[in-house]
Amino acid sequence: MFTIFKKEINVFFDSLYGVIIFSIFFLINGLFIWVFPSSNIFEYGISSLDIFFDIVPYIFILFISSITMKIVSEERSLGTFEILLSQPVSNKDIILGKFLSTWFLSILLIFLTFPYWITIYNLSNPLGNIDNIIIINSYIGLVLLVGAMNSIGIFFSSLFQNQIISFLSSCFIFYLLYEGIDMINYYDSINLVDSFIDHFTFSYHYSNFTRGIFQINSFIYFIIVMLSFFYF
């Protein structure tokens, strides 16, 4: 498992693809948080990272779909996945190693956004007048959210040999689980299943963390999603 993990990390950082993906992630984040007038922190007027935590899940939809789309499907199309299976390592160890590598890359991106936190801290008036508990819980929720997304992304990568189909399928499911079901509820005039469906959405459980609430049921929800798609 560790060998697979190390291999995937090295492949990602040894390629121009990895540099481009990381650069695009921070470019989009930076534009929304510091530049665009409708969303930048300076016009928001409050020392808070709420804007970042509202925007970043949508950026991760594209990022995670991009890094997971090829992680299994490419090896299958090239025939190298069968070579891996011939080695003294189980199929589950291969998938687990790949999952941990993509989750690690996602967590690394999250970790590299900590300067946003430091900047907000220093911009606050008086100095340090920010709600650190909300920020910490939001980061925990984001780590769990991207873990669930990576699990689903690898599932679709193993399902399809075509990387484009894998990418589009992941994007669709991520958006459906995060935003799409809420849109369905919005147009539901009866609202009989509204609260029931909400409990199955990423946004519902992620929003618990972004409100500064560590709810064990939301933690368990994300763990169940990860395990469910891993064992698929």
Regions found by a protein language model. Give the residues of each.
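Hydrophobic alpha-helical membrane-insertion segments
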Residues: 16, 22-24, 102-110, 167-184
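Terminal transmembrane helical anchor/hairpin motif
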Residues: 36-50, 166-232
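Short amphipathic alpha-helical coupling elements at transmembrane boundaries
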Residues: 3-11, 82-86, 198
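Secretory targeting signals
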Residues: 31-34, 46-59, 101-163
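Hydrophobic alpha-helical transmembrane segments
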Residues: 1-63, 67-70, 220, 225-232
